[in-house]
Structures are given as structure tokens and as C-alpha cells.
């Protein structure tokens, strides 16, 4: 668990996710079979206003941690709107003119053809997604980027669950770092969510359930 104090941007993002109904509390059965006391459904950032605001959080995080030139790659399908909206936010808010591209899951054999849509994949490439679980989509994105002769530089996600993928195994983020060699940035992390809830009177009653979940499945050293 991170020992750093929650930042203003993390606090603002978590409030935004909760107020938007994207981050909810209760009992949710995950694909893994675990019963989680919270659920983050980024698919509910489904209006222009919500997507634009989400993109500003991605852009602010990237502007702070990626001083060098880079381009964005959005894995199909969830990464597509994230890449486009974040590139726009980087230009509008940070004067960073970042190319973006995404892949088709089905290769097109007419028109412009091919698998890649958008800018030519070149240079340092940051992969953008909402969350990671198994890391399969990230691995496929790395293959596409390397096949184009470019450098997979980092992955950015909205929320790092900081949760082991199997008993005593690494978290999805740790696995991507160790197995795929990618730096991983996140707008917010599970440990910061607990801190945010602890400091928010009308939500502090959720803390004990999240702490119990962290104690059972969390990556305390991440």
C-alpha cells in the first residue's frame, strides 16, 4: 500500500467517479469469483461531459509524469475513446500535441485497409486503458507497437486496484511491470480510495469493508 498522502487530483478524481456512479459500494461478485465491496465501471463515463472530464484527469496525470514526447495507443475497444479524448485534453489544457492511434479487432481489407487507425505508430508510445485485470490487451498492444518499430513506453489506467490476481501472486499492475517491462501510471489507486473515504464523513462507513478486502487480497507492498 502506498504511504504517500493523497493528492488533490486523486481526491478530485475519486469524488468525480463516485458522484458519477462509476465507483460504487456494496457487494459485487467479480469474474474471479471474489466478492468485492466496491466496483469501478468505467463504461459509465458514457456522456460527452463525463468523457471530457475523465480525459482531463488522464491528461493531467500524463503531463505530470511524461515530460518527453510520446503518442497514445488505445487498445480496441475501450481504449479508443480514451485515446482520442485524452489527446484532445492534452492539446487544450497542456499545449501537448500528442498523436494517437488505435487498432481494429477485425483487419479491414478495403478502403484504407489494415489494422491500425490514426497516426503512424512511432517513437515512445503510451498505452491507455481504464483498468487492467489479466493484462492480455496490454500484451497485444505491445506486440502491435513493437511490430511497427516503436517503443512501448508506459501504460496509463484510471484505477489501480492494487489486488493480487491469484493467491500470493502479483497484482495485474505488478505483472505488467515485471513480465512486460512497462511503467504503469494510474490516476488513482485503491490505497488512496481508502484514504479518501476515511476523510469523507458520509462515506467513512465503507472503510472497514475495503480494509478487510485489502487485508485479504491487497498488495501491501505495491
Regions found by a protein language model. Name each.
Residues 1-128, 133-222:
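PRPP-associated nucleotide enzymes
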Amino acid at each position: 500500500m502506498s504511504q504517500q498522502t493523497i493528492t488533490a487530483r486523486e481526491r478530485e478524481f475519486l469524488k468525480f467517479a463516485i458522484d458519477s456512479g462509476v465507483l460504487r459500494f456494496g457487494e459485487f461478485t467479480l469474474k474471479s469469483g471474489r466478492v468485492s465491496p466496491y466496483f469501478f465501471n468505467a463504461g459509465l463515463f458514457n456522456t460527452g461531459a463525463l468523457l471530457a472530464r475523465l480525459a482531463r484527469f488522464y491528461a493531467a496525470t500524463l503531463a505530470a509524469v511524461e515530460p518527453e514526447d510520446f503518442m497514445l495507443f488505445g487498445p480496441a475497444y475501450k481504449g479508443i475513446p480514451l485515446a482520442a479524448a485524452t489527446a484532445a485534453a492534452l492539446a487544450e489544457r497542456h499545449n501537448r500535441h500528442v498523436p494517437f492511434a488505435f487498432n481494429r479487432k477485425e483487419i479491414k481489407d478495403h478502403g484504407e485497409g489494415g489494422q491500425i487507425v490514426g497516426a503512424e505508430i512511432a517513437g515512445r508510445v503510451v498505452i491507455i486503458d481504464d483498468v487492467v485485470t489479466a493484462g492480455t490487451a496490454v500484451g497485444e498492444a505491445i506486440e502491435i507497437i513493437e511490430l511497427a518499430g516503436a517503443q512501448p513506453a508506459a501504460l496509463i489506467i484510471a484505477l489501480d486496484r492494487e489486488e493480487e490476481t491469484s493467491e500470493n501472486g502479483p497484482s495485474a499492475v505488478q505483472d505488467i511491470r515485471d513480465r512486460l517491462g512497462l511503467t504503469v501510471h494510474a490516476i488513482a489507486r485503491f490505497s488512496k480510495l481508502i484514504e479518501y473515504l476515511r476523510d469523507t464523513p458520509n462515506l467513512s462507513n465503507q472503510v472497514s469493508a475495503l480494509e478487510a478486502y485489502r487485508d485479504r487480497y491487497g498488495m501491501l507492498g505495491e
